C-alpha cells in the first residue's frame, strides 16, 4: 500500500514499512486445508423437574476451541460446570429439585459453524417445540461489564437479576456498574436511557454462538450472557 506510514499500534511484525493506503496492492495467498472427517460430541445432562418435568430450561456453552481455549470457550464453560456442580450437590444434600427440568449442554464443533448445537436442535426439533421454555447461552468471558442480549420477554426477569447480583470488581450491583458506563457513552440513546432509568436493557441477539439453532431455527426464547470490555 501507499499513503501515510501507519501508526505504531497498527503495524505488524513483517520486515516492511506499513502504510495506511490507498494504493494498488497485490497479495498472493497459499491456502492449506485439512479435509479429515472426525467425530464431534455433545455432552448432555438433565436434572428432572419436580413439578413440570416436560418444561425444559436449557443451559449451554461449547467445549471446542481454535487453540487452547482458555478464553473461548473455557471461561464460559467452567461457569456452566460450576452451576451444574452446585445444583447437583445441593440436590443431593437437601433433596431439592428444580420445578422445571434443567438441561445442561456442552456443545461440540461450535467453531466450525455451530455444528454440534444446530445438529442437536434439528434432531430434537419436535420435542424442543413442545418442551423448551428457554435457552441460556454463554461463550467467552472476561473482566469488565455484564453484557446480555436476548428475547425481550426475558428483559424484566433479567433486570431483576442484574440489580440483585453484586459486580465482582466494584462492589455495586451489576446493573449499576453498567449504568455508570452508559452515562458516559458517546451514543446519545444509550446515554439518555441511563440518565432516565437504571433499567437493564437486553440487546438484540445476532448470530455466531450456540443460541442460533434455538432462537433462529425454532423461535425458542433465548439469551446470551457474558462479561467483557
Briefly describe each language-model feature range:
Residues 36, 50-51, 96-98, 127-129:
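Solvent-exposed alpha-helices and their adjacent loops that cap or buttress functional pockets
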Residues 36-37, 71-75, 150, 206:
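Short, contiguous, pocket-lining structural segments
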